[in-house]
Amino acid sequence: MLMYRRDFLKSVTAAWVAFGLPNPLGGPFATNRVIALRRLGQSQRFDYEWLKEHARALAAAPYHSRKRVLPTPLERLSWDQYQSIRYRQDHALWADSDAHFQVKFFHLGLYFHSPVRMYEVVDGMAQELAYDPAAFDYGSSGLNGKRLPKDLGFAGFRLNTRKDTDRDFAAFLGASYFRAVGQEGQYGQSARGLAVNTGSSGPEEFPDFIAYYLEQPTSDADTVVLYGLLDSPSIAGAYRFSITNGDVLLMDIDSALYPRETIERLGIAPCTSMYQVGENDRRMGWDWRPEIHDTDGLFLLTGNGEWIWRPLCNPPYLRFNMFLDNNPRGFGLLQRDRDFDHYQDDGVFYEKRPCLWVEPKHGWGEGSVQLVEIPTFDETFDNIVSFWNPRNKPHPGQELLFGYRLYWGGLPPVSSSLAYCVATRTGLGGVVGQKRKYFSWRFAVDFVGGKLAALASVHDVSVEPVLHMTRGRAEIVSARPLHEIRGYRVMFDVVPLEDSTQQIDIRLYLRDTNGEPLTETWLYQWMPPILEERKMY
């Protein structure tokens, strides 16, 4: 599906807003009686190798869209009406077994026009599951299920545990989007099966999962396995997901991709998030809440072992960055700031939003982690994307294999002995009480952890900030203990060259007297304001 990103994500983001809330049908509509879903056709032999061959054959044929014209009542649903449609607990897949997991399906309508075929896999045999209007309670939607087509199909699905049928721990809905939660039980950023031409000058392509194969778990299984068949105008693919629910939810993913055409920018393991306003960027800070973001930084563990933190921004125009690497060890969008007082939102709880860490299972070779930051005026638009882009462009006839793990939760599963950044603040530079002779911008970067706590309590210890900038000059540079956080604060002013508004890339870390690094590397990209704005200060 080809669309401009803002139009597509405006709809998909809205549809995820209420995820993670209790399902009202888990209460009054829950019964002990289980109604088995109707099956379609004959069962057929199934495994991942079969799915890969199916995807390869799909890529060899011309693409055709599966988007359909829905009945008018479904097309005209408001968000509140669509959200009131709930899948009945007594129709949940595997509710009639002793499996630890259950599946509930999403209805088509509103923004979701492409039916996704659903299959159950039992003992290596797959059989399609039939849509049944009676499996849904239509709430306040005004819909009459008896008047809907019997072959309408499903939009997606969510996963629950038998112990908690009211809350889902993962959901797959819209194009190739999916989300999951850790112990915080809060949805936030999302992942996708694939990104195509994200951040390019033309329309972005949003591949669709056109079919899912749900493998029935055994009674003692703590992992649920499912498969996805992906298709789009330029590429097809087969995916295997092994999902283990826990304090940090783990998705072990294998993907096999088959291009139909040469792709300019392929994004592997894309993460999608939202950043409107934060400590370092208050350009859109007119809201009463101090901070509004799902994540506050991109975290990288490079192939050569460097730990990098790049705070996110809400730029005035689309901004694209690439971080060249060879066999990256991991990357992800993190929500490091976990203090409710910094957000003050008791409705969506941004401090509980999950981090998402991508860990390659094998060498991915040369390429780059790419970061796209898009301007947004409000929190309903996901404007942050990160993904891995292989150096070589994919061509028709190739098979591209990528295996990786996704970790959803409060913190990534990796940690360093180095100190890490906990806050980046910016504001007007200069010396308080003295008239400014020129414009400068102040940065205050806080580091904690590692050896800093011990060093902060010792007098006459030299900790040196190492600061590099691509242009401009730095002044009033300091690094001093900040006992309130048991760490260090680095402060410096950046003075842009003349009236240039060209971006300035900043690189910073702390080292000891022996030249050994004490902190991760902090990266930032600052856009100096135009000359007229500088004169205002």
From Swiss-Prot:
Q: In which pathway does it act?
A: Glycan metabolism; osmoregulated periplasmic glucan (OPG) biosynthesis
* Listed name of the protein: Glucans biosynthesis protein D
Keywords attached to this entry: Periplasm, Signal
| Family from the record | Belongs to the OpgD/OpgG family.
Q: Which GO terms describe its molecular function?
A: carbohydrate binding; catalytic activity
Main function: Probably involved in the control of the structural glucose backbone of osmoregulated periplasmic glucans (OPGs).
GO-annotated cellular components: outer membrane-bounded periplasmic space
Compartment annotation: Periplasm
Q: Which gene encodes it?
A: opgD
Task: Enumerate the Gene Ontology biological process terms.
Answer: beta-glucan biosynthetic process
Give the species this sequence originates from.
Xylella fastidiosa (strain 9a5c)
What Gene3D superfamilies does the entry give?
Answer: 2.70.98.10, Immunoglobulins
